[in-house]
Amino acid sequence: MSYAAAFLAVASRHGERITLERNGEVLGTGLALLRPIYDRRGQFRPTDLGLERREQVLCMAQADLPLEPAPGRTLIRCKEGVYRVVNVRRVTAGLELVYWRAILEREVEGL
């Protein structure tokens, strides 16, 4: 069993189905583990009405998804809502892509 297959087995048991979009075009669907990031600094940003909390999530998505960094607005849709991809990195074991690690930020509805 490869590392990617082992990750996919964990994601199929504990993860959820997501849809990956870039610039309004659906690129694929797959499984991912999504976990909130609570202890990260900088989750509050100033607005005209005071401080606003940015909800950030750690996403570990299956290797089959085309999540590589690219120009444009990349979104992940899941049952909890819509998230914008802030940062994405490959997690590899040797030359094998095991999964994608991404930091997501919740999108505000209507923007």
Predicted feature residues:
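Active-site-proximal polar cores
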Residues: 1-26
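Short, conserved turn/kink motifs that form compact alpha/beta structural patches or helix kinks used as
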Residues: 22-111
